[in-house]
Amino acid sequence: MPSTFPGLLLDHAARRPSAPALREKEFGIWQTLTWGELAVLVRAIACGLVEAGLARGQHLVVIGENRPRLYASMLAAQALGAIPVPLYQDAAAAEFVFPMGNAEVGFAIVEDQEQVDKMLEVRASCPQLARIWFDDPRGLRHYGETGLAPLDALIAAGRAYDAQHPGFFAAEVAKTRPADVAAMFYTSGTTGHPKGVVHTHETLIDRAAAGARFDKLTADDEVLAYLPPAWIGQNIFSYAQWLVCGYVVNCPESASTVTIDLKEIGPTYYFAPPRVFEGLLTSVMIRMEDAGRIKRWLFDRAMALARRIGPARMDGRPVGAIDGLRYALGDLLIYAPLRNTLGFSRVRVAYTAGEAIGPDLFTFYRSIGINLKQLYGSTETAVFV
């Protein structure tokens, strides 16, 4: 297995160029980007960045929701030996000043007008920020600030540079070593200024591969990427493990469509903080309160059985034959439809982290056949301890 993220990308592109790598929902329709297409896009962005002046060891800020071209931008920076720095898209402009000054960031690729406005505001305190590119041009037609341009322009410049220097991209990827810095993540800064945590290709790939082996992840898995890319947990599940395993990462249309998109995609590998699992359970209980008496009675009986033997079944412990038959009937009538309603019909492995999850909540999901596990980790340990 290649030992750097750009190396992993090129390996997938060579072995399975037509396999889906990323999907993005746009105007209600899922658009697919294959590994071959992704490699071509990364090559163009990388060549555009070097033509713009990004050098090995310099930092590139990436801000936005989970978007294929932002993922490609991170890969492009890594291919050049530069260091992507994802920052939280919901942060105020003032919150960007410290990390961007601390990392001496001179280049930024952002999602849309909201993030462009923040970068222009930040420039007063971070004069080294020379170039800003944006993915979504809506609302930005009349912006004429120096150094501001659409990502499409960067890609076009990169293609021209690549045509003049055809061996450049491959040579840069070959220079990148496992011990080189792959990304910098900033902590929340609850006790002071945020701390920049540096991870190499080696550390991130090692943690991602270890988790993939433990959970038996393969290229056939599907992930829904909806948490902030600046959080290292999201980066591990939807970036590092994605490149290690070669599975498909699905990017929702917006935060408001995540629940719908979850049901449409039916991910096999899922991560969410406890509040998401709590919200889903609350919605189920509210719906059952409005259900008819017979349906409520069936649900209560089935859940009583599930709480009694479901966790044992999930842990592989034996249960009685009669209880097993009852559970199978409950799965047919209650548990499987419930998993489908939640969007968990295909989930093999589900994780939660960030805070402790209540035992009742934990028991509920494992009782109905969802392999939910508590994850302990930190930014410094690349999620997994």
For the regions a language model picked out, list residue spans one by one.
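Conserved AMP-binding/adenylate-forming core of the ANL superfamily
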Residues: 22-67, 71-75, 92-97, 150-155, ...
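Structural core segment of the AMP-binding/adenylate-forming
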Residues: 10, 47, 51-52, 79-157, ...
